[in-house]
Amino acid sequence: MIKLEQLVLASHNAGKLKELQAMLGASVKVRSIGEFSQVEPEETGLSFVENAILKARNAARLSGLPALADDSGLAVDFLGGAPGIYSARYADGRGDAANNAKLLEAMKDVPDAERGAQFVSVLALVRHADDPLPILCEGIWEGRILREARGAHGFGYDPLFWVPERDCSSAELAPEEKNRLSHRARAMALLKQRLGL
């Protein structure tokens, strides 16, 4: 079991930072990679796992601290898993609104029965940059893609992701509830279990 007093979170994404800090709680002091560098590593992996490890190693190298990275995205069944690892850059880096518009356009003629999707999160924790045994935890949240945006909470694809067990979009959930149900919450629960938190 790894004992952590502090770690660096390998993300400049304010939404992810807020979610993951809330999930980790006060037992571990979380610092942002932004305290050490504004440069993000090139995500050259072909999977969420590869990119999470790459980001964690980079953050550990820059900070000298244990590092936690999240690589996550939306995998839409009808689109063969796209946008997948390219979720944040789906509309050529033009932001959440453009990503959502592109997804709605790609799905406009898709019947309801074929709109299944999953939010996927892979957390990678490394003790140091050359850690030969990263801890990997995966969370998957099943849902479907709506025909229009709904809700004002969250970020990314949350307004388009229907949560069947709550009969609403992810963006209609209170942040506390999303932090209990989401793909990141599922991955974080596994990580906390592995760390004995």
Swiss-Prot record:
GO cellular component labels: cytoplasm; cytosol
Primary enzyme class = hydrolase
**Binding positions (substrate):** 11-16, 72, 155-158, 178, 183-184
Binding sites annotated in the UniProt record for Mg(2+): 42, 71
Reactions accelerated catalytically: XTP + H2O = XMP + diphosphate + H(+); dITP + H2O = dIMP + diphosphate + H(+); ITP + H2O = IMP + diphosphate + H(+)
Could you tell me what the cofactor note in this record states? Answer: Binds 1 Mg(2+) ion per subunit.
Say yes or no: keyword S-adenosyl-L-methionine present. Answer: no
Q: Which cysteines are joined by disulfide bonds?
A: none
Q: Which residues form the active site?
A: 71
User: Which cofactors go with this protein?
Assistant: Mg(2+)
Q: Does the keyword Metal-binding apply?
A: yes
Which UniProt keywords are present, listed alphabetically? Hydrolase, Magnesium, Metal-binding, Nucleotide metabolism, Nucleotide-binding
Q: Which domain of life is it from?
A: Bacteria
**Could you say which EC number(s) this protein's record lists?**
3.6.1.66
Q: Which GO terms describe its molecular function?
A: dITP diphosphatase activity; ITP diphosphatase activity; metal ion binding; nucleoside triphosphate diphosphatase activity; nucleotide binding; ribonucleoside triphosphate phosphatase activity; XTP diphosphatase activity
GO annotation, biological process: nucleoside triphosphate catabolic process; nucleotide metabolic process; purine nucleoside triphosphate catabolic process
Kindly list the residue ranges recorded as spanning the membrane.
none
Function description:
Pyrophosphatase that catalyzes the hydrolysis of nucleoside triphosphates to their monophosphate derivatives, with a high preference for the non-canonical purine nucleotides XTP (xanthosine triphosphate), dITP (deoxyinosine triphosphate) and ITP. Seems to function as a house-cleaning enzyme that removes non-canonical purine nucleotides from the nucleotide pool, thus preventing their incorporation into DNA/RNA and avoiding chromosomal lesions.
Provide the family line: Belongs to the HAM1 NTPase family.
Q: Quaternary structure per UniProt?
A: Homodimer.
**What PANTHER family does this protein map onto?**
INOSINE TRIPHOSPHATE PYROPHOSPHATASE, INOSINE TRIPHOSPHATE PYROPHOSPHATASE/HAM1 PROTEIN
Q: What is this protein called?
A: dITP/XTP pyrophosphatase
Its source organism is Pseudomonas aeruginosa (strain ATCC 15692 / DSM 22644 / CIP 104116 / JCM 14847 / LMG 12228 / 1C / PRS 101 / PAO1)
